[in-house]
C-alpha cells in the first residue's frame, strides 16, 4: 500500500496536562491528516474528555505516578493505524508534518543534537514508526518507569531493523515548561543515567511481558 494511503494514528498519553493537551490537540485536528487520535488518560486528577469523532480517550484508574513506557505501550496497543505518530501532550504540529514524515523501511525520531535552542531538545521524544515495527520490538521498555532514556532505548532497538531518520523540527514545536514538572521534581540527568543502566541490565525483548490495565472510555464532553 502507498504510504500516503496508510491509516495514520496519533498516540498520546497524559497525566494532569490538560491545558497543554488542549493546545496540542487543536493543532493535531487542524492538520486533518490523522485518521484517529488515541489518548490515554493516565489517572489525571480530573478525567480528560474531548468531543470529536477522531478522538478516542481511554482512562487508566489508580496510577499514582507517571510512567511513559507503560502509558504509551497501552496507547499503541489501542491504535488501529498502520503508522504511529507518538506525540507528547505538549507537542504542537504544523502544516506539512505528516507528509514530511512517512516511514517506509525507516522510522523518524527526535534528535536533541539538532535542537536550535534548549526548548527544541524536548522534541527528542517524538517518534513516527510503522505499527508493525513498533510491535516487533515490543514497544517501550517497561522496566524504565521514570523519566529519561526510554526514547533512546527504543530508538536503539528499532535501528537494528530500520533506518533511523531525524524529525524535521520545522514542522513541530514544544510548549515550554520546567524540567521539574516533566520529571516530577527529580533530577533529570540523574534519572537518565539510572535508566540507561536499567536498559542495559534489563533488556526489553520481544517476549517481555507488558503490563495490563482496566480501562474506561471517557464520556464525550469538550474540555
PLM regions with names:
Residues 25-63:
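Acidic donor-binding segment of Leloir-type glycosyltransferases
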Residues 81-92:
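Short beta-strand-to-loop acidic/aromatic patch adjacent to the donor-nucleotide binding site
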Residues 108-123:
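Short beta-strand-to-loop element that shapes/binds the nucleotide-sugar donor at the catalytic cleft/hinge
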Residues 138-156:
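Donor nucleotide-sugar recognition loop
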Residues 152-223:
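C-terminal catalytic/acceptor-binding lobe
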Amino acid at each position: 500500500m502507498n504510504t500516503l494511503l496508510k491509516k495514520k494514528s496519533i498516540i498520546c498519553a497524559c497525566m494532569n496536562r490538560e491545558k497543554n493537551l488542549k493546545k496540542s490537540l487543536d493543532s493535531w485536528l487542524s492538520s486533518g491528516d490523522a485518521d484517529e487520535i488515541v489518548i490515554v488518560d493516565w489517572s489525571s486528577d480530573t478525567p480528560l474528555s474531548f468531543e470529536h469523532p477522531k478522538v478516542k480517550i481511554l482512562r487508566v484508574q489508580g496510577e499514582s505516578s507517571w510512567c511513559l513506557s507503560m502509558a504509551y505501550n497501552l496507547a499503541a496497543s489501542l491504535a488501529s493505524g498502520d503508522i504511529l505518530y507518538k506525540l507528547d501532550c505538549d507537542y504542537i504540529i504544523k502544516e506539512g508534518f505528516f507528509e514530511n514524515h512517512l516511514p517506509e523501511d525507516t522510522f523518524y525520531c527526535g534528535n536533541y543534537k539538532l535542537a536550535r535552542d534548549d526548548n527544541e531538545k524536548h522534541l527528542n521524544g517524538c517518534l513516527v514508526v510503522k505499527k508493525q515495527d513498533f510491535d516487533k520490538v515490543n514497544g517501550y521498555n517497561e522496566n524504565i518507569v521514570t523519566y529519561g532514556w526510554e526514547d533512546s532505548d527504543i530508538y536503539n532497538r528499532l535501528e537494528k531493523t530500520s533506518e533511523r531518520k531525524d524529525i524535521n523540527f520545522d514542522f513541530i514545536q514544544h510548549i515550554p515548561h520546567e524540567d521539574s514538572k516533566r520529571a516530577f521534581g527529580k533530577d533529570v540527568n540523574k534519572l537518565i543515567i539510572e535508566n540507561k543502566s536499567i536498559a542495559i541490565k534489563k533488556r526489553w525483548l520481544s517476549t517481555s511481558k507488558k503490563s495490563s490495565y482496566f480501562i474506561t472510555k471517557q464520556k464525550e464532553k469538550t474540555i
